[in-house]
Amino acid sequence: MIIKPRVRGFICVTTHPAGCAASVREQIAYVARRGPIERGPKKVLVIGASTGYGLAARIAAAFGVGAATLGVFFERAPADAKPGTAGWYNSAAFHDEAAARGLQATSVNGDAFSDEIKHKTIDAIRRDLGQVDLVVYSVAAPRRTHPKTGVTHQSTLKPIGHAVRLRGIDTDNEAIKETLLQPATPDEIADTVAVMGGEDWRMWIDALDAAGVLADGAKTTAFTYLGEQVTHDIYWNGSIGEAKKDLDRTVLALRGKLAARGGDARVSVLKAVVTQASSAIPMMPLYLSLLFKVMKARGTHEGCIEQVDGLLRDSLYSAQPHVDAEGRLRADRLELDPAVQARVLELWDQVTDDNLYTLTDFAGYKAEFLRLFGFGIDGVDYDAPVEPNVRIPNLIE
């Protein structure tokens, strides 16, 4: 079938298998150009492994180090001529490329928040890897059903204590708009922490440790975004910020647990990129469009694979990691360059409907958004029929 992009709001409802595969190959090629990652991990578990930063971590570990990988994700398979999700096709392509190079790859498809998927993952580690020496936690989900209580918590993107008016882009109509966000209630804050805080990461590490599948010296990291002044009302000072602070508290306990066996636990702070999650946040398309414009002009623009490849080389497996005062690994240094942030702030209120395409890189933002779903990738013939029914080998469901 011939598959074209169909966008509704912040979701593209179609995906292109060949485009997703080409995107994965591009990321692998980038890692290969950088050369081997010294002293990297050998057996890696990535929780949230099918898109964005999690996929980039799996690619960097496999093709930069030669690591065996186990990926956990929650994706929809193709069915009845309806394409699967982008993460499904990304993972299928990853498996194909890993097999071509003789690299061990296993995947588990299901709800990472559940006890069932944790148990299936542990069984797969025992069978295929024995133990893991790196656990990457990169889960982005709007809701979580708690495995112990059965309560489903919904995350909320709201300020705390007062309403906030945010500038942004109506991406459907390509117009500047303002959104008034009311403050979160205490219950909404607690629910957001339950979804996006550190509890599930801790549950994963506790379960892996109790099962004996964490190697001595194992490391774990959870990915997060903090941002700077322009995004603080909605991130660090908002309901999501409370979840991020919970992540900071959680990592201290995990670090103590792993340090006893020569290991480590860190929160890794990454730069703002286009993801399905970020595109749904009212101010982020405008912020990203401005950030892309400024960073591309300076030659410092990076995407997921550049960020995570650099994180492994320069911090996670470096003798001189980039660490902030709170002990977080920082890969977002170029985004937070004072000159970059000053220029973004300078342009922020100048953007109008008329100059959207000149003051910002909204065109680049839109292109990156479509790339998430396999569209706009160099070398792919989008007028040619493509087979949507792609399977993932070594998949546990």
Curated annotation (Swiss-Prot):
Disulfide bonds: none annotated. The record marks E75 as: Plays an important role in discriminating NADH against NADPH. InterPro entries: Eno_Rdtase_FAD-bd_dom, Enoyl-CoA_Rdtase_cat_dom, FabV-like_NADH_b, Trans-2-enoyl-CoA_reductase. It comes from Burkholderia mallei (strain ATCC 23344). This is Enoyl-[acyl-carrier-protein] reductase [NADH]. Optimum pH is 7.9. Pfam families: Eno-Rase_FAD_bd, Eno-Rase_NADH_b, Enoyl_reductase. Coiled coil: none annotated. The active site is at Y235 (proton donor). NCBIfam families: EnoyACPredFabV, PRK13656.1. Pathway: Lipid metabolism; fatty acid biosynthesis.
